[in-house]
């Protein structure tokens, strides 16, 4: 049986996940050992500490893919982000500055504010 990790912070030095490439590769080796075939990399965006723009994330994913190939780590990596819900969220998703889930433009992984759920949340459709 294979598994998909749909929320992962293995991109090195980009948010509060992997501190460096060595740690990122170690995390993905463990994923491979645990029969995870696909990893959707979802660094934080707009959460007050991190603003990882889409093209920077795409570049980081490509760098990590290359490192995985060089280290014989056979896990398929997919681009994404964990977008903190702010007044900028919809605009950034529509413009492409924030990444959608798997970079397909169909859905987004949204991180809700820690202390409240915004009014009108159910009305958000892109």
Protein language model features and the residues they cover:
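Metal-cofactor-binding active-site regions of metalloenzymes
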Residues: 2, 10, 47-48, 71-89, ...
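Short, flexible loop segments at the rims of nucleotide/cofactor-binding pockets, characterized by
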Residues: 16-17, 112-115
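An N-terminally biased module of ancient metal coordination in phosphate/nucleic-acid-related enzymes
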Residues: 1-74
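Active-site gating loops and adjacent loop-to-helix segments of metal-dependent hydrolytic enzymes
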Residues: 6, 40, 94-105
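N-terminal Rossmann-like or analogous alpha/beta NTP/dinucleotide-binding catalytic cores
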Residues: 64, 91-92
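HAD-like small-molecule phosphatases
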Residues: 103-109, 122
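Conserved small/polar residues in nucleotide/adenosyl-binding loops
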Residues: 124-126
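Active-site-adjacent beta->alpha loops and helix N-cap segments on the catalytic face
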Residues: 117-121
